[in-house]
A protein has these predicted regions:
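Terminal, contiguous helix-loop blocks that mediate binding/assembly
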Residues: 1-149
Length: 149
């Protein structure tokens, strides 16, 4: 995953134990119930450049999002659930790192947090209808707990 250089050295990879996802969903749902605010999109690790207006605010590190909004106890439970679910994770230091052939940093994303799972963070109840998100079980069973308390 990490054999390329510069702009082409772009990868996150995870191996997930799917049998652990129900416990993870329960832990994240409880964390969202404990949250006093919606995680700030500008404060959570994104995996798309904020300059990319087509895809920004869609791909966030799950654990970093939870840690930014939930109680410490709820975040610790999610961290344990992530550890149980993520068998392997790795990431390059940047996504689309600028280099001699790509001297701009418009799309460059520094990866500071990578728990192995990403999430979409709706900023309001209305965001649940964006791109069919409300049709996903994760949206209705887990993410909706940010707003339906």
């Amino acid at each position: 995953f990490d054999a390329m250089q510069g702009y082409d050295r772009t990868c996150t990879i995870s191996v997930i134990r799917t049998a652990a996802l129900d416990a993870l969903a329960e832990a994240v749902g409880n964390a969202w119930l404990s949250a006093t605010a919606v995680p700030s999109a500008s404060a959570v690790q994104q995996f798309v450049s904020p300059n990319d207006y087509t895809y920004r605010y869609r791909y966030f590190d799950l654990l970093h999002a939870v840690e930014s909004a939930a109680t410490p106890e709820a975040a610790a439970a999610v961290s344990a659930a992530v550890d149980a679910a993520v068998v392997y994770r790795a990431a390059t230091p940047y996504l689309w790192e600028k280099d001699a052939d790509h001297p701009w940093d418009y799309y460059q994303v520094k990866i500071d947090c990578h728990c192995g799972l990403t999430t979409y963070i709706p900023s309001s109840q209305a965001d649940f209808d964006t791109y069919g998100y409300s049709q996903l079980e994760w949206a209705t069973d887990v993410a909706s707990k940010l707003f339906n308390k």
